Swiss-Prot record:
Top-level division of the source organism's lineage: Bacteria
Protein name per UniProt: Probable transcriptional regulatory protein GK2594
GO biological process terms, semicolon-separated: regulation of DNA-templated transcription
Pfam families: TACO1_YebC_N, Transcrip_reg
Disulfide bonds, paired cysteine numbers: none
HAMAP family, per the entry: Transcrip_reg_TACO1 (MF_00693)
Length: 246
């Protein structure tokens, strides 16, 4: 994985989402609701809930919003049944796109996702058409300004805790784990005094596609359109966004 900062692409996406904070909080509340409903409202015994709560806190979601979503899921009132659906397709220039949705209306969601692709130079594909281009990984990002630590020392700590590898950029250390090792590595590094700019299980592209001109504009519009949809939780893609820094 060396030579390309996956966190840069993810961070750029998160910054765009932060600009739409109200919508982001709504989506996080839905994710908390689903996790609490399926695994219980105690984060100590529900790893999925614990992880999404940490993600919500990292996004500065108010604690009362988090508690409200948990209480809604574990209370006696009528529950909303959300279903997770994944769509796969191609953006302009053959960029691979995976869209993760939580929806209570599959027909509405399918129509909206299909329209987003069609209007922005892409097309939906069959299940599995691009998923093989991504790998599910735990990603822990440590801000270098916040931690005065030797790179080799941190790498040794991470590997001993169960991490697979670490990448270093000017701004951060990016530690990658297998999904099943994520909590163990995270807990061990926290015990060593580290905090994280981001901690999540995500989909990492194995290769990247570079676009320019109209194709790049259409691809960015496709991402924005999908992320604006209330049913869409995550948009993963293999667009090389480093060109946006130039």
């Amino acid at each position: 994985m060396a030579g390309h900062s996956k966190w840069k692409n993810i961070q750029r996406r998160k910054n765009a989402q932060d600009a739409k904070r109200g919508k982001l909080f709504m989506k996080l509340a839905k994710e908390i609701y689903v996790a609490a409903k399926s695994g219980g409202g105690d984060p100590a015994s529900n790893p999925s809930l614990r992880l999404v709560i940490e993600k919500a806190k990292a996004a500065n979601m108010p604690s009362e919003n988090i508690e409200r979503a948990i209480k809604k899921a574990t209370g006696t009132q009528e529950h909303t049944n959300y279903e997770e659906i994944r769509y796969e397709g191609y953006g302009p220039g053959g960029v691979a796109v995976m869209v993760v949705c939580l929806t209570d209306n599959k027909n509405r969601t399918a129509a909206n996702v299909r329209a987003a692709f069609a209007k922005n130079g892409g097309n939906l594909g069959e299940t599995g058409c691009v998923s093989y281009l991504f790998e599910r990984k735990g990603l822990l990002v440590i801000d270098r300004e916040q931690h005065n630590v030797d790179e080799d020392e941190l790498l040794l700590l991470a590997i001993e805790a169960g991490a697979e590898e670490m990448e270093t950029t000017d701004e951060s250390f990016e530690i990658y784990t297998a999904p099943e090792s994520f909590e163990t590595v995270k807990d061990e590094l926290e015990q060593q005094g580290f905090t994280f700019a981001s901690a999540e299980i995500t989909m990492i592209p194995q290769t990247y596609t570079t676009l320019e001109g109209d194709d790049l504009k259409k691809m960015l519009k496709l991402i924005d359109t999908l992320e604006d949809d209330d049913d869409v939780q995550e948009v993963y893609h293999n667009l090389d966004e480093s060109v946006l820094e130039e």
